Amino acid sequence: MIRLTGVTYSYPDAEQQALRDVNLAVDAGEILGIVGASGAGKTTLAKIITGFIPHVDGGNLAGSVTVDGSDVAGMRLADSVAKVGLVLQNPFNQISGAKYTVRDEIAFGLENVGVPREEMLRRVLDVARLLGITDLLDRSPYDLSGGQQQLVAIASMVVLRTPVLVMDEPTSQLDPLGTRMVFHVLEALRAAGTTVVVFEHKVELLAEHCDRVAVVAEHTLAAVGLPGEVFVDDRLDGWGIGATRFTRAAREAVRRGLLPVRSALPVTVEDAMATFGRGRGVRS
């Protein structure tokens, strides 16, 4: 589904490369978690996958980036956005304006691509229910907390059902329950065939919910593999990721053959699949 081959990028007027020689393949229906120290190049990688680089940020991009066989750099930005949804780290950057309600915000993308009103309203309500924000639908996003705004931003992308969803630190302002609900929805999206790439610093979430994880270090991909392989790598400390209580515990758990235990959630995967299993694509 996603293929990056020999990708190297530098921002306009930058002396140092933001990313160099990145090679990555992500399959359809896979959740790939990406972790890395601050400044390692994670956000740059997210922008490249979604087409915001080079279309918005400019700069010098070399190598090949394809999504579902299409060259992302060669697409119009509007076409790449139809294939790849992006949830930004700062949810305020995705809010359209003070005159809109949360319902309007979530429905905005569906309205733009001509989804019939009845279908649009149903899908908005379905996603709001899954993320626990139905009581916010008639409020202004400007009146919400940062965590609530983050859930609205996630809902506005999830509702589109793009083939690929890229999320840049989607849980940075969420409480533990909100965080786990989001990852539960991502599991349902995966089961429905969506490819998810999630950039997240909470390695315990990636270990529990992702099929594979990748480490961005020193502006390239330092490791890609199963969570049980990557998070016990002795090089984590040098990459700025290790030496946490979780990674130490993970190493011991893997050595003992233990598996993570998932907590009960108010939304089941079966319930979520009833929503996302109704069809693929923004016009389903």
Where are these regions (language model features)?
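The feature captures the beta-strand-to-loop junction immediately N-terminal to the Walker
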Residues: V35-A37
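ABC ATPase NBD Q-loop/coupling interface
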Residues: S64-D79
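Conserved ABC ATPase "signature" region
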Residues: E111, E118-L136
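Conserved ABC ATPase signature
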Residues: S140-L144, Q148
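Catalytic Walker B motif of ABC-type/P-loop ATPase nucleotide-binding domains
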Residues: L165-D168
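H-loop/switch region of ABC-family ATPase nucleotide-binding domains
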Residues: E200-H201
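Conserved beta-strand-loop-alpha-helix hinge in the C-terminal portion
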Residues: T220-F246
